[in-house]
Amino acid sequence: MRGQWSLLLGPARLCLRLLLLLGYRRRCPPLLRGLVQRWRYGKVCLRSLLYNSFGGSDTAVDAAFEPIYWLVDNVIRWCGVVFVVLVIVLTSSIVAIAYLCVLPLILQTYSVPRLCWHFFYSHWNLILIVFHYYQAITTPPGYPPQGRNDMTTVSICKKCINPKPARTHHCSICNRCVLKMDHHCPWLNNCVGHYNHRYFFSFCFFMTLGCVYCSYGSWDLFREAYAAIEKMKQLDKNKLQAVANQTYHQTPPPTFSFRERVTHKSLVYLWFLCSSVALALGALTIWHAVLISRGETSIERHINKKERQRLQAKGRVFRNHYNYGCLDNWKVFLGVDTGRHWLTRVLLPSSHLPHGNGMSWDPPPWVTAHSASVMAV
C-alpha cells in the first residue's frame, strides 16, 4: 500500500514543483503566476497562525477535534435528564405490567407458598433497585475541597488549575474534578465517584437480578402470549378476506377482546425488554465487578495498563497500590466491616458512607497483612 502511494505522490510532487518554478519566470502566464503567489501566501498565513514549536501532530489533532468534544459533552449533559426519565418510565411500565397483567394470571395457577416467595422476593428486589438508583442520582460523587493546603496533592488539574489528590480526575461534562472518578454515567445524569460508586454498582447488580427474574419467571406466559398474538394476526387476516369475499352469511371468526390483546402484547413487551436489559446491563455489571476485584476504576484500568507495559519493557513488575486482594477490595468497596454488615449494608438499603474521604487512601485497619504487603511497592 505504501509503495502504491509513493508511485502516485511522486508525479504529483513533480508537477507541483514545475508549476512553482514556472511561477517565478517572467514568461509564465499571469494567471499561473498569481495562483502560485496566492498558494505561497496562504501557506505563510496558515503557518503564522498555527505554528507552535512546542506542538506536534497530537496537539493539532486535539485542536481539530475540540469542537466535537464540546458538542458531545454538551449533548450528554442535556440528554442525561432524558435518560433518567427513560429509566423511570421503562421501570414503571414493567412494574405496572407485573401488577395488572402477570399477577391476575399467577393468582389462578400458583400455590400459596410459591406466591409468597414471589411476593417477598420481587418487592425486596424492587425496593433495592429504587433505593440505589435514587441514591446514585442524588448523591454527589465527591469533589476536592477548594482552598485547602493540608490535603495530599499528587498533581495539578490542567482544566481547573487546582490541586488534584490521588485517584481524582476531571470530568469534562460536569466541568469539575471528581474524587475517585470512574466515569460519567448519562443514565444517572451524574458522575460515578467516591461517594456514589457503591450505589451505581448496586443498582446495576439488582436491576440485572430483577430483569433475569422477570425474564425467567415470565417465560411460559411469554410463549402463550406470543402464540396468541400470532393467532390474532391470522384471525384478523381471515376476517379481512371474508369481508373482501362478501361472505356475510358465514359466522365471523371469534376475536380476542381488547383486554386480552393488551395483556398478550404487554407480556411480550415485558419479556423482550427484560431479556435485552439483562444481557446488556449484566455484561456491564460483570465488567465493573472485575474492576472492583482488582481495586481499580475504569479510568485507572487504562492508566495501569500503560504503566504495566512501560515497566514490563524495563523488566520490572507493576503493583497496584490500591489492590488489597479480591475479598478485601469488596469489603472496602461495600463498606463491610463485620459479618453482620453483609446483611445490613448489602442485602438491605443502607446509606452508610464509604471508607476514607476520597483524598487519602490509607488501608482500613482490618485489611489483612498480605494486602498491606502488596501495597508496599
From Swiss-Prot:
<dbReference type="GO" id="GO:0007507">
    <property type="term" value="P:heart development"/>
</dbReference>
<dbReference type="GO" id="GO:0019706">
    <property type="term" value="F:protein-cysteine S-palmitoyltransferase activity"/>
</dbReference>
<dbReference type="GO" id="GO:0006915">
    <property type="term" value="P:apoptotic process"/>
</dbReference>
<protein>
    <recommendedName>
        <fullName>Palmitoyltransferase ZDHHC16</fullName>
        <ecNumber>2.3.1.225</ecNumber>
    </recommendedName>
</protein>
<keyword id="KW-0808">Transferase</keyword>
<feature type="active site" description="S-palmitoyl cysteine intermediate">
    <location>
        <position position="185"/>
    </location>
</feature>
<feature type="transmembrane region" description="Helical">
    <location>
        <begin position="80"/>
        <end position="100"/>
    </location>
</feature>
<comment type="subunit">
    <text>Interacts with ABL1. Interacts with COPS5/JAB1.</text>
</comment>
<feature type="topological domain" description="Lumenal">
    <location>
        <begin position="101"/>
        <end position="116"/>
    </location>
</feature>
<feature type="topological domain" description="Cytoplasmic">
    <location>
        <begin position="288"/>
        <end position="377"/>
    </location>
</feature>
<dbReference type="InterPro" id="IPR001594">
    <property type="entry name" value="Palmitoyltrfase_DHHC"/>
</dbReference>
<dbReference type="GO" id="GO:0021537">
    <property type="term" value="P:telencephalon development"/>
</dbReference>
<keyword id="KW-0227">DNA damage</keyword>
<dbReference type="Pfam" id="PF01529">
    <property type="entry name" value="DHHC"/>
</dbReference>
<keyword id="KW-0256">Endoplasmic reticulum</keyword>
<keyword id="KW-0012">Acyltransferase</keyword>
<feature type="transmembrane region" description="Helical">
    <location>
        <begin position="199"/>
        <end position="219"/>
    </location>
</feature>
<dbReference type="GO" id="GO:0006974">
    <property type="term" value="P:DNA damage response"/>
</dbReference>
<feature type="transmembrane region" description="Helical">
    <location>
        <begin position="117"/>
        <end position="137"/>
    </location>
</feature>
<feature type="topological domain" description="Cytoplasmic">
    <location>
        <begin position="138"/>
        <end position="198"/>
    </location>
</feature>
<dbReference type="GO" id="GO:0005794">
    <property type="term" value="C:Golgi apparatus"/>
</dbReference>
<dbReference type="GO" id="GO:0018345">
    <property type="term" value="P:protein palmitoylation"/>
</dbReference>
<dbReference type="GO" id="GO:0016409">
    <property type="term" value="F:palmitoyltransferase activity"/>
</dbReference>
<dbReference type="InterPro" id="IPR039859">
    <property type="entry name" value="PFA4/ZDH16/20/ERF2-like"/>
</dbReference>
<dbReference type="GO" id="GO:0021899">
    <property type="term" value="P:fibroblast growth factor receptor signaling pathway involved in forebrain neuron fate commitment"/>
</dbReference>
<feature type="domain" description="DHHC">
    <location>
        <begin position="155"/>
        <end position="205"/>
    </location>
</feature>
<dbReference type="GO" id="GO:0001654">
    <property type="term" value="P:eye development"/>
</dbReference>
<feature type="topological domain" description="Cytoplasmic">
    <location>
        <begin position="1"/>
        <end position="79"/>
    </location>
</feature>
<keyword id="KW-0053">Apoptosis</keyword>
<keyword id="KW-0812">Transmembrane</keyword>
<comment type="similarity">
    <text>Belongs to the DHHC palmitoyltransferase family.</text>
</comment>
<keyword id="KW-1133">Transmembrane helix</keyword>
<comment type="function">
    <text>Palmitoyl acyltransferase that mediates palmitoylation of proteins such as PLN and ZDHHC6. Required during embryonic heart development and cardiac function, possibly by mediating palmitoylation of PLN, thereby affecting PLN phosphorylation and homooligomerization. Also required for eye development. Palmitoylates ZDHHC6, affecting the quaternary assembly of ZDHHC6, its localization, stability and function. May play a role in DNA damage response. May be involved in apoptosis regulation. Involved in the proliferation of neural stem cells by regulating the FGF/ERK pathway.</text>
</comment>
<keyword id="KW-0472">Membrane</keyword>
<feature type="transmembrane region" description="Helical">
    <location>
        <begin position="267"/>
        <end position="287"/>
    </location>
</feature>
<dbReference type="GO" id="GO:0005789">
    <property type="term" value="C:endoplasmic reticulum membrane"/>
</dbReference>
<feature type="topological domain" description="Lumenal">
    <location>
        <begin position="220"/>
        <end position="266"/>
    </location>
</feature>
